[in-house]
Protein backbone atom coordinates (compact mmCIF):
# COMPACT_ATOMS: atom_id res chain seq x y z
CA UNK A 1 0.00 0.00 0.00
CA UNK A 2 2.87 2.36 0.82
CA UNK A 3 4.50 1.75 -2.57
CA UNK A 4 1.19 2.43 -4.33
CA UNK A 5 0.78 5.70 -2.40
CA UNK A 6 4.34 6.80 -3.19
CA UNK A 7 3.76 6.00 -6.85
CA UNK A 8 0.60 8.09 -6.88
CA UNK A 9 2.37 11.01 -5.25
CA UNK A 10 5.22 10.83 -7.74
CA UNK A 11 2.81 10.79 -10.69
CA UNK A 12 1.00 13.80 -9.22
CA UNK A 13 4.25 15.73 -8.81
CA UNK A 14 4.01 15.68 -5.00
CA UNK A 15 7.00 15.19 -2.67
CA UNK A 16 7.42 11.74 -1.08
CA UNK A 17 5.76 11.04 2.25
CA UNK A 18 9.02 9.78 3.77
CA UNK A 19 11.84 11.96 2.42
CA UNK A 20 14.49 9.94 4.26
CA UNK A 21 17.94 11.20 5.33
CA UNK A 22 19.49 14.33 3.86
CA UNK A 23 21.68 12.49 1.34
CA UNK A 24 18.68 10.63 -0.02
CA UNK A 25 16.70 13.88 -0.31
CA UNK A 26 19.66 15.43 -2.10
CA UNK A 27 19.91 12.58 -4.60
CA UNK A 28 16.16 12.70 -5.24
CA UNK A 29 16.14 16.46 -5.76
CA UNK A 30 15.70 17.41 -9.43
CA UNK A 31 17.52 20.68 -8.82
CA UNK A 32 20.76 18.81 -8.02
CA UNK A 33 20.88 17.04 -11.37
CA UNK A 34 19.73 20.12 -13.27
CA UNK A 35 22.51 22.14 -11.62
CA UNK A 36 25.19 19.53 -12.30
CA UNK A 37 24.28 19.57 -15.99
CA UNK A 38 23.61 23.28 -16.52
CA UNK A 39 26.51 24.92 -14.64
CA UNK A 40 29.26 23.35 -16.83
CA UNK A 41 27.10 24.09 -19.87
CA UNK A 42 26.86 27.75 -18.83
CA UNK A 43 30.63 28.00 -18.38
CA UNK A 44 31.19 26.51 -21.82
CA UNK A 45 28.68 28.95 -23.34
CA UNK A 46 30.40 32.00 -21.88
CA UNK A 47 33.89 30.87 -22.85
CA UNK A 48 32.81 30.07 -26.40
CA UNK A 49 31.03 33.40 -26.79
CA UNK A 50 34.14 35.20 -25.57
CA UNK A 51 36.24 33.35 -28.13
CA UNK A 52 33.76 34.24 -30.87
CA UNK A 53 33.44 37.94 -30.05
CA UNK A 54 37.03 38.82 -29.10
CA UNK A 55 38.87 38.58 -32.46
CA UNK A 56 38.36 41.09 -35.26
CA UNK A 57 36.27 39.91 -38.21
CA UNK A 58 37.07 40.89 -41.79
CA UNK A 59 34.23 40.74 -44.34
CA UNK A 60 34.62 39.98 -48.08
CA UNK A 61 34.25 43.66 -49.00
CA UNK A 62 37.27 44.54 -46.84
CA UNK A 63 35.35 46.10 -43.96
CA UNK A 64 36.31 45.10 -40.43
CA UNK A 65 34.14 44.48 -37.38
CA UNK A 66 36.29 45.16 -34.34
CA UNK A 67 36.37 42.50 -31.64
CA UNK A 68 35.62 43.10 -27.97
CA UNK A 69 38.61 43.60 -25.69
CA UNK A 70 38.69 43.05 -21.93
CA UNK A 71 38.52 46.74 -21.02
CA UNK A 72 35.45 47.25 -23.19
CA UNK A 73 33.76 44.19 -21.68
CA UNK A 74 34.40 45.39 -18.13
CA UNK A 75 33.05 48.85 -18.87
CA UNK A 76 30.04 47.41 -20.72
CA UNK A 77 29.28 45.02 -17.86
CA UNK A 78 29.34 47.94 -15.42
CA UNK A 79 26.69 49.81 -17.44
CA UNK A 80 24.57 46.71 -18.07
CA UNK A 81 24.46 45.35 -14.53
CA UNK A 82 22.23 48.11 -13.14
CA UNK A 83 19.34 47.37 -15.46
CA UNK A 84 19.68 43.66 -14.72
CA UNK A 85 19.62 44.26 -10.96
CA UNK A 86 16.45 46.36 -11.09
CA UNK A 87 14.49 43.92 -13.24
CA UNK A 88 15.78 40.89 -11.34
CA UNK A 89 14.57 42.40 -8.06
CA UNK A 90 11.13 43.03 -9.57
CA UNK A 91 10.72 39.45 -10.81
CA UNK A 92 12.03 37.95 -7.58
CA UNK A 93 9.50 40.07 -5.70
CA UNK A 94 6.78 38.73 -8.00
CA UNK A 95 7.69 35.17 -7.00
CA UNK A 96 6.32 35.68 -3.51
CA UNK A 97 3.52 33.19 -2.85
CA UNK A 98 5.38 29.93 -3.53
CA UNK A 99 8.90 31.30 -3.96
CA UNK A 100 11.53 29.17 -5.61
CA UNK A 101 14.93 28.51 -4.13
CA UNK A 102 17.57 31.14 -4.94
CA UNK A 103 19.44 28.47 -6.91
CA UNK A 104 16.45 28.12 -9.25
CA UNK A 105 16.41 31.90 -9.76
CA UNK A 106 20.12 31.79 -10.54
CA UNK A 107 19.68 28.92 -13.01
CA UNK A 108 16.89 30.78 -14.82
CA UNK A 109 18.98 33.96 -15.03
CA UNK A 110 22.03 31.96 -16.12
CA UNK A 111 20.07 30.18 -18.83
CA UNK A 112 19.12 33.49 -20.43
CA UNK A 113 22.58 35.00 -19.94
CA UNK A 114 24.63 31.99 -21.09
CA UNK A 115 22.69 29.31 -22.94
CA UNK A 116 20.05 31.43 -24.67
CA UNK A 117 22.56 33.99 -25.95
CA UNK A 118 24.90 31.21 -27.14
CA UNK A 119 22.10 29.48 -29.05
CA UNK A 120 20.86 32.75 -30.52
CA UNK A 121 24.31 33.86 -31.69
CA UNK A 122 24.88 30.61 -33.57
CA UNK A 123 21.46 30.39 -35.23
CA UNK A 124 21.23 34.11 -36.01
CA UNK A 125 24.74 34.09 -37.50
CA UNK A 126 23.88 31.09 -39.65
CA UNK A 127 20.65 32.79 -40.78
CA UNK A 128 22.59 35.95 -41.61
CA UNK A 129 24.99 33.97 -43.80
CA UNK A 130 22.08 32.29 -45.55
CA UNK A 131 20.62 35.73 -46.27
CA UNK A 132 23.97 36.87 -47.68
CA UNK A 133 25.03 39.37 -45.09
CA UNK A 134 28.47 40.05 -46.54
CA UNK A 135 29.46 43.41 -45.07
CA UNK A 136 30.01 44.97 -41.68
CA UNK A 137 27.16 47.41 -42.30
CA UNK A 138 24.55 47.03 -39.54
CA UNK A 139 21.71 47.51 -42.06
CA UNK A 140 22.66 44.24 -43.74
CA UNK A 141 21.30 42.27 -40.79
CA UNK A 142 17.79 43.73 -40.85
CA UNK A 143 16.06 40.70 -42.35
CA UNK A 144 17.52 38.16 -39.89
CA UNK A 145 16.72 40.53 -37.00
CA UNK A 146 13.07 40.74 -38.05
CA UNK A 147 12.25 37.28 -39.38
CA UNK A 148 14.71 34.92 -37.64
CA UNK A 149 15.86 36.39 -34.33
CA UNK A 150 12.39 36.65 -32.68
CA UNK A 151 11.66 32.94 -33.17
CA UNK A 152 15.11 31.87 -32.02
CA UNK A 153 15.41 34.18 -29.03
CA UNK A 154 11.91 33.65 -27.64
CA UNK A 155 12.18 29.87 -28.00
CA UNK A 156 15.63 29.76 -26.39
CA UNK A 157 14.61 31.99 -23.47
CA UNK A 158 11.48 29.92 -22.72
CA UNK A 159 13.25 26.55 -22.91
CA UNK A 160 14.28 26.76 -19.25
CA UNK A 161 10.60 26.97 -18.27
CA UNK A 162 9.77 23.74 -20.08
CA UNK A 163 12.79 22.02 -18.50
CA UNK A 164 11.73 23.03 -15.00
CA UNK A 165 8.13 22.01 -15.62
CA UNK A 166 9.24 18.60 -16.89
CA UNK A 167 11.51 17.91 -13.90
CA UNK A 168 9.47 19.60 -11.17
CA UNK A 169 5.92 19.14 -12.43
CA UNK A 170 3.43 20.34 -9.78
CA UNK A 171 5.88 20.07 -6.90
CA UNK A 172 7.18 23.62 -6.81
CA UNK A 173 6.29 25.47 -9.99
CA UNK A 174 3.35 27.83 -9.41
CA UNK A 175 1.78 30.18 -11.92
CA UNK A 176 3.54 33.30 -10.68
CA UNK A 177 6.79 31.37 -10.45
CA UNK A 178 6.56 30.61 -14.18
CA UNK A 179 6.21 34.32 -14.98
CA UNK A 180 9.03 35.24 -12.58
CA UNK A 181 11.43 32.59 -13.90
CA UNK A 182 10.66 33.52 -17.50
CA UNK A 183 11.32 37.15 -16.66
CA UNK A 184 14.65 36.27 -15.03
CA UNK A 185 15.66 34.33 -18.13
CA UNK A 186 14.82 37.36 -20.27
CA UNK A 187 16.72 39.69 -17.93
CA UNK A 188 19.79 37.45 -18.20
CA UNK A 189 19.53 37.45 -21.99
CA UNK A 190 19.19 41.24 -22.11
CA UNK A 191 22.13 41.59 -19.69
CA UNK A 192 24.59 39.75 -21.94
CA UNK A 193 23.13 41.28 -25.09
CA UNK A 194 23.59 44.76 -23.62
CA UNK A 195 27.19 43.92 -22.74
CA UNK A 196 27.81 42.98 -26.37
CA UNK A 197 26.14 46.12 -27.74
CA UNK A 198 27.79 48.45 -25.22
CA UNK A 199 31.17 46.80 -25.78
CA UNK A 200 30.91 47.19 -29.55
CA UNK A 201 29.95 50.83 -29.14
CA UNK A 202 32.91 51.43 -26.82
CA UNK A 203 35.37 49.75 -29.20
CA UNK A 204 33.96 51.47 -32.28
CA UNK A 205 33.97 54.97 -30.79
CA UNK A 206 37.47 54.53 -29.36
CA UNK A 207 38.92 53.49 -32.74
CA UNK A 208 36.91 55.71 -35.08
CA UNK A 209 37.58 59.44 -35.10
CA UNK A 210 34.38 60.21 -37.03
CA UNK A 211 32.27 58.77 -34.20
CA UNK A 212 32.72 61.93 -32.14
CA UNK A 213 32.76 61.94 -28.36
CA UNK A 214 33.09 58.29 -27.22
CA UNK A 215 31.51 58.90 -23.81
CA UNK A 216 28.49 60.66 -25.29
CA UNK A 217 27.96 57.86 -27.81
CA UNK A 218 28.15 55.20 -25.10
CA UNK A 219 25.75 57.13 -22.85
CA UNK A 220 23.30 57.39 -25.73
CA UNK A 221 23.18 53.65 -26.38
CA UNK A 222 23.04 52.95 -22.63
CA UNK A 223 19.99 55.19 -22.30
CA UNK A 224 18.40 53.64 -25.37
CA UNK A 225 18.87 49.98 -24.46
CA UNK A 226 19.26 50.15 -20.68
CA UNK A 227 16.43 52.59 -19.92
CA UNK A 228 14.04 53.46 -22.75
CA UNK A 229 13.67 49.99 -24.29
CA UNK A 230 14.84 47.90 -21.33
CA UNK A 231 11.36 46.38 -20.96
CA UNK A 232 11.41 44.68 -24.37
CA UNK A 233 12.89 41.25 -23.63
CA UNK A 234 11.09 40.78 -20.28
CA UNK A 235 7.79 41.86 -21.83
CA UNK A 236 8.00 39.39 -24.73
CA UNK A 237 9.05 36.46 -22.55
CA UNK A 238 6.26 37.28 -20.11
CA UNK A 239 3.77 36.56 -22.90
CA UNK A 240 5.09 33.02 -23.28
CA UNK A 241 5.21 32.65 -19.50
CA UNK A 242 1.60 33.78 -19.12
CA UNK A 243 0.56 31.16 -21.66
CA UNK A 244 2.33 28.50 -19.61
CA UNK A 245 0.74 29.86 -16.43
CA UNK A 246 -2.72 29.54 -17.96
CA UNK A 247 -1.90 25.97 -19.02
CA UNK A 248 -0.82 25.04 -15.48
CA UNK A 249 -4.20 25.96 -14.02
CA UNK A 250 -6.35 24.50 -16.81
CA UNK A 251 -8.15 21.16 -16.70
CA UNK A 252 -8.69 21.01 -20.45
CA UNK A 253 -5.92 19.29 -22.41
CA UNK A 254 -6.76 21.50 -25.38
CA UNK A 255 -6.08 24.64 -23.30
CA UNK A 256 -2.87 23.13 -21.93
CA UNK A 257 -1.56 22.77 -25.47
CA UNK A 258 -2.89 25.94 -27.11
CA UNK A 259 -2.22 28.43 -24.28
CA UNK A 260 1.61 28.12 -24.35
CA UNK A 261 1.55 28.13 -28.14
CA UNK A 262 -0.60 31.27 -28.22
CA UNK A 263 1.70 32.99 -25.72
CA UNK A 264 4.75 32.09 -27.81
CA UNK A 265 3.12 33.39 -31.00
CA UNK A 266 2.24 36.69 -29.29
CA UNK A 267 5.81 37.00 -27.99
CA UNK A 268 7.30 36.34 -31.43
CA UNK A 269 4.87 38.72 -33.12
CA UNK A 270 5.62 41.51 -30.67
CA UNK A 271 9.36 40.88 -31.00
CA UNK A 272 9.17 41.00 -34.80
CA UNK A 273 7.18 44.24 -34.68
CA UNK A 274 9.63 45.78 -32.22
CA UNK A 275 12.71 44.83 -34.25
CA UNK A 276 11.06 45.95 -37.48
CA UNK A 277 10.18 49.40 -36.17
CA UNK A 278 13.60 49.83 -34.53
CA UNK A 279 15.44 48.78 -37.71
CA UNK A 280 13.41 50.66 -40.32
CA UNK A 281 12.68 53.95 -38.53
CA UNK A 282 14.83 56.70 -37.11
CA UNK A 283 14.79 57.48 -33.42
CA UNK A 284 12.76 60.65 -34.02
CA UNK A 285 9.93 58.64 -35.60
CA UNK A 286 9.80 56.06 -32.81
CA UNK A 287 8.34 58.27 -30.09
CA UNK A 288 4.72 57.30 -30.84
CA UNK A 289 5.60 53.61 -31.03
CA UNK A 290 7.48 53.90 -27.75
CA UNK A 291 4.41 55.31 -26.02
CA UNK A 292 2.36 52.45 -27.46
CA UNK A 293 4.88 49.96 -26.09
CA UNK A 294 4.72 51.63 -22.68
CA UNK A 295 0.94 51.27 -22.80
CA UNK A 296 1.35 47.54 -23.43
CA UNK A 297 3.79 47.29 -20.52
CA UNK A 298 1.27 49.08 -18.33
CA UNK A 299 -1.46 46.68 -19.43
CA UNK A 300 0.68 43.64 -18.59
CA UNK A 301 1.65 45.15 -15.25
CA UNK A 302 -1.99 45.87 -14.40
CA UNK A 303 -2.90 42.31 -15.40
CA UNK A 304 -0.24 40.93 -13.06
CA UNK A 305 -1.45 43.15 -10.20
CA UNK A 306 -5.04 42.00 -10.73
CA UNK A 307 -3.81 38.41 -10.89
CA UNK A 308 -2.01 38.85 -7.57
CA UNK A 309 -5.20 40.24 -6.01
CA UNK A 310 -7.20 37.34 -7.41
CA UNK A 311 -4.58 34.92 -6.18
CA UNK A 312 -4.83 36.25 -2.63
CA UNK A 313 -8.59 35.74 -2.77
CA UNK A 314 -8.10 32.13 -3.88
CA UNK A 315 -5.70 31.53 -0.99
CA UNK A 316 -8.20 33.09 1.39
CA UNK A 317 -11.05 30.87 0.17
CA UNK A 318 -8.99 27.71 0.45
CA UNK A 319 -7.81 28.62 3.95
CA UNK A 320 -11.45 29.25 4.90
CA UNK A 321 -12.19 25.67 3.83
CA UNK A 322 -9.60 24.36 6.27
CA UNK A 323 -10.82 26.72 9.00
CA UNK A 324 -14.34 25.36 8.66
CA UNK A 325 -12.94 21.88 9.13
CA UNK A 326 -11.19 22.99 12.32
CA UNK A 327 -7.70 22.47 10.91
CA UNK A 328 -6.60 26.13 11.08
CA UNK A 329 -7.16 29.04 13.42
CA UNK A 330 -9.36 32.05 12.65
CA UNK A 331 -6.45 34.46 12.37
CA UNK A 332 -4.59 32.23 9.90
CA UNK A 333 -7.13 33.09 7.21
CA UNK A 334 -6.75 36.84 7.77
CA UNK A 335 -2.98 36.95 8.23
CA UNK A 336 -1.72 34.63 5.50
CA UNK A 337 -4.06 35.83 2.77
CA UNK A 338 -2.68 39.37 3.08
CA UNK A 339 0.61 40.15 1.28
CA UNK A 340 1.34 43.09 3.58
CA UNK A 341 0.92 41.07 6.78
CA UNK A 342 3.17 38.38 5.33
CA UNK A 343 5.82 40.99 4.55
CA UNK A 344 5.62 42.31 8.11
CA UNK A 345 6.10 38.81 9.51
CA UNK A 346 9.09 38.28 7.21
CA UNK A 347 10.74 41.53 8.31
CA UNK A 348 10.03 40.86 11.98
CA UNK A 349 11.51 37.37 11.65
CA UNK A 350 14.66 38.75 10.02
CA UNK A 351 15.14 41.21 12.89
CA UNK A 352 14.77 38.41 15.45
CA UNK A 353 17.49 36.17 14.11
CA UNK A 354 17.96 33.53 11.41
CA UNK A 355 16.21 30.75 13.33
CA UNK A 356 13.03 32.75 13.89
CA UNK A 357 13.02 33.99 10.31
CA UNK A 358 13.57 30.50 8.92
CA UNK A 359 10.72 29.03 10.97
CA UNK A 360 8.41 31.89 10.04
CA UNK A 361 9.23 31.62 6.34
CA UNK A 362 8.77 27.84 6.43
CA UNK A 363 5.43 28.24 8.20
CA UNK A 364 4.20 30.65 5.51
CA UNK A 365 5.47 28.37 2.76
CA UNK A 366 3.66 25.36 4.24
CA UNK A 367 0.37 27.18 4.72
CA UNK A 368 0.56 28.57 1.18
CA UNK A 369 1.30 25.11 -0.21
CA UNK A 370 -1.69 23.83 1.74
CA UNK A 371 -3.96 26.37 0.03
CA UNK A 372 -2.47 25.60 -3.39
CA UNK A 373 -2.88 21.86 -2.94
CA UNK A 374 -6.51 22.37 -1.97
CA UNK A 375 -7.07 24.55 -5.04
CA UNK A 376 -5.52 21.90 -7.29
CA UNK A 377 -7.81 19.28 -5.76
CA UNK A 378 -10.85 21.47 -6.42
CA UNK A 379 -9.82 22.13 -10.02
CA UNK A 380 -8.89 18.53 -10.68
CA UNK A 381 -5.34 19.37 -11.79
CA UNK A 382 -3.61 17.02 -9.33
CA UNK A 383 -3.88 13.27 -9.11
CA UNK A 384 -4.25 10.84 -6.19
CA UNK A 385 -2.12 11.39 -3.13
CA UNK A 386 -3.06 15.05 -2.68
CA UNK A 387 -5.43 14.35 0.23
CA UNK A 388 -2.67 12.57 2.11
CA UNK A 389 -0.37 15.49 1.36
CA UNK A 390 -2.82 17.98 2.90
CA UNK A 391 -2.88 15.97 6.14
CA UNK A 392 0.93 16.03 6.23
CA UNK A 393 0.98 19.80 5.72
CA UNK A 394 -1.53 20.40 8.51
CA UNK A 395 0.57 18.34 10.96
CA UNK A 396 3.78 20.14 9.93
CA UNK A 397 2.06 23.52 10.38
CA UNK A 398 0.92 22.67 13.91
CA UNK A 399 4.37 21.40 14.86
CA UNK A 400 5.98 24.62 13.64
CA UNK A 401 3.39 27.05 15.04
CA UNK A 402 4.92 27.54 18.55
CA UNK A 403 8.31 28.56 17.12
CA UNK A 404 7.15 30.80 14.24
CA UNK A 405 5.75 34.33 14.10
CA UNK A 406 2.08 33.96 13.16
CA UNK A 407 0.40 37.13 14.44
CA UNK A 408 1.41 40.61 13.18
CA UNK A 409 -1.10 42.41 15.43
CA UNK A 410 0.88 44.28 18.07
CA UNK A 411 4.15 42.93 16.67
CA UNK A 412 6.97 45.41 16.12
CA UNK A 413 9.34 44.79 13.24
CA UNK A 414 12.35 45.70 15.36
CA UNK A 415 12.04 44.08 18.80
CA UNK A 416 11.99 46.46 21.74
CA UNK A 417 15.05 46.43 23.90
CA UNK A 418 14.46 45.19 27.40
CA UNK A 419 15.88 47.82 29.73
CA UNK A 420 17.38 46.30 32.86
CA UNK A 421 15.42 47.27 35.93
CA UNK A 422 17.42 48.90 38.75
CA UNK A 423 18.26 46.55 41.55
CA UNK A 424 16.21 47.49 44.60
CA UNK A 425 18.12 48.88 47.56
CA UNK A 426 18.30 46.46 50.47
CA UNK A 427 16.15 47.45 53.40
CA UNK A 428 17.45 46.56 56.85
CA UNK A 429 14.96 46.10 59.65
CA UNK A 430 15.09 48.82 62.28
CA UNK A 431 15.79 47.31 65.71
CA UNK A 432 13.09 48.05 68.26
CA UNK A 433 13.81 50.65 70.92
CA UNK A 434 14.43 49.33 74.39
Where are these regions (language model features)?
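Hydrophobic alpha-helical segments at protein termini of multi-pass membrane proteins
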Residues: 1-434
Amino acid sequence: MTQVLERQRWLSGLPPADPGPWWKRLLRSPILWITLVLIPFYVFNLIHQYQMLSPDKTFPDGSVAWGLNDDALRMAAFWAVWTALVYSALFIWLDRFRPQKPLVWLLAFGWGACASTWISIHINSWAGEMMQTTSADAAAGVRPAIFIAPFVEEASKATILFLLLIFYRNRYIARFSVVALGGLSAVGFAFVENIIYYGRAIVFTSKTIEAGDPEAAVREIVLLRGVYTSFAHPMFTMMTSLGLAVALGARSKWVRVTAPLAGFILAVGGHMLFNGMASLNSQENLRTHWYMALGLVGFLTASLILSIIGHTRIIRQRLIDFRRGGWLEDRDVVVFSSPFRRIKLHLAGICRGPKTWWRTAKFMRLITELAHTREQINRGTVGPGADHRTHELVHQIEELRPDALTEPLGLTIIPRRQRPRPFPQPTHPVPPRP
